[in-house]
Amino acid sequence: MSDTKGSDLNEDSALEFDEESYHESEDEDFDPSKEQNKRKTTNDNKKTDVNANISDSDQDEDEDEEYDEEAQEEEKKYSSIVSESGGLIKTRRARLQEEHDALKNKYEQIDIAETSGKSNDLWRQLKERALSRSQFNGSVMDQDAGSITDSMQEQKILIERTYKFAGEVIKEKKWVLRHSAEGQEYLNSIKFKTGTLDKNTVPPDTVKNTQAQQTEGKQNRVNEAGRLLKRHLKRPPILEQIIAGNLKPKLTTLEKSQLDWASYVDKEGIHEELNLHNKDGFLAKQDFLNRVESSKDQKYRELRKLQLQTEQQKQ
């Protein structure tokens, strides 16, 4: 029992061994040469670590210096980029402006050399040839235009109107086509004929008669003694005054609107279209209704006559 207790105490004492009070030199198998080698290796390792740290720092510094130099060079290059419009960065508008200026000023830097005598002579000959050609073409076109205008003048009539409308005397003078709406309206309206438009409108005999009557009237106003007579001459008829142009016919609103409509139709050139798609107006409808009523009355009279005849036969 005592032996077992002693072994237990030795184990406990071994467990309670203090590591700090332990020295390797106190061991029996201690070798001092190994200790020195070990110390040398640790020192060498420390030196290599320090040198590695120093080399890493130097390399980082070198890289930083190289980066700074490259950045400075890039900054210098960037600072030298200046566009013509004054900005560092060339925008789309600046590029468009440069293209526009280049197109606008592309002939400013061209050197104009003196032309030779042959080129001047050649240029003069070309100009003379072009001028003669234009004169020839112009003369041919003028002749064609003259013939066309002559043919058109044959189909046109001159309208001269002098009428009073809304308290104002209106004078009109223009050429219109004979087959146009305004021309037909003028030819159909006897009331507004003045005699200077068409030779058939006013016969020359009527004009001569009116002039002779006026001269005779002036001569009859003076007797043999040279005194003026107080008798009144016969007033000329209204139709002759209208023909002679002394009396201005008055135009109603309906007649004026009809005249304006005819001129508008000729101006727009819709005469044929109106004739093609004409559905008749108010007057045409009234004429149609009057014809229907007259036909009804005629049929009623015929039936009434037949009825009377049958009654007479029965009696």
Curated annotation (Swiss-Prot):
GO terms for cellular component: Swr1 complex. InterPro entries: BCNT-C, Swc5/CFDP1/2. Residues 9-30, 57-73 have a biased composition (Acidic residues). Keywords: Activator, Chromatin regulator, Coiled coil, Nucleus, Transcription, Transcription regulation. It holds the Pfam family BCNT. One of its GO terms (biological process) is chromatin organization. It comes from the Eukaryota. Residues 56-115 form a coiled coil. Residues 31-49 have a biased composition (Basic and acidic residues). Residues 1-84 are annotated as: Disordered. The keyword Nucleus applies. Component of the SWR1 complex which mediates the ATP-dependent exchange of histone H2A for the H2A variant HZT1 leading to transcriptional regulation of selected genes by chromatin remodeling. Involved in chromosome stability. Component of the SWR1 chromatin remodeling complex. This is SWR1-complex protein 5. The gene is SWC5.
